[in-house]
Amino acid sequence: IKVKYSSLNFKDALSASGNKGVTRNYPHTPGIDAAGIIEKTSGSKFKPGDEVIVTGYDMGMNTSGGFGEYINVPQEWIVKKPDNLTLSESMAFGTAGLTAGLCLRKLLTHGLKPDDGDVFVSGVTGGVGIISLMLFKKLGFSVSAITGKLDQEEFLKSLGANQVIDRNTLDLDLISPLQKPIYSGGIDAVGGKILSNLICST
């Protein structure tokens, strides 16, 4: 695949910094996302000229990744680019967009609706968080954005956050296993004590 676009993810930074839990062998080319054009294939699923996306699996970890000019990966790792996205747009979403989309789809499958009440997004200034906020807003939800970067409040509200909450108010030992219900659901990109407190108020 001739790579046209990639995106930068936290896992790429871990790989580049020598984290052996992500990448075992160096030298190495990171990039867990790639969008490009098939130039040659030994499989039957795709043909030369197809515009495709690769995200996840082992690419960019222990298989040369999307920051290279070319990638050579199993056809099972490849998906055809949706017709309504350009190659560059698909990488604007990348792994972060895929993660946010999968989370939101699971919530909607379980019946979450805007009328059910406020939802939260923690870690909202990261890739998964920002895309989650925008997707929730597009579907008509009222969103509480939880962040440690309060200087980004105006930016988050411009993306659709109804309120911005200081994560330090949630980064505490569990206040109570049953707290007053505040949220009908949410997407967490932080974990730990923050997630524990959010679960108890959902």
Q: Model-flagged regions — what are they?
A:
Residues I37, D50-E51, Y70, D118, ...:
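Residue-level marker of beta-strand positions
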Residues K47-P48, T86, K113-P114:
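Residue-level recognition of short, solvent-exposed, well-ordered loop/turn junctions
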Residues M91-T169:
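Mid-domain Rossmann-like dinucleotide-binding core that forms the NAD(H)/NADP(H) cofactor-binding site
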Residues L112-K113, S144, L159, Q163-T202:
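Glycine-rich cofactor phosphate-binding loops and adjacent beta1-alpha1 units
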Residues I1-L8, N19-M59, G65:
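Glycine-rich beta-strand-centered segment in the early N-terminal region that forms part
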Residues N72-K80, N84:
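Structured surface patches comprising rigid loops and adjacent beta-strands/short helices at the edges
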Residues M59-Q75:
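A structural motif shared across PLP-dependent enzymes of the aminotransferase-like
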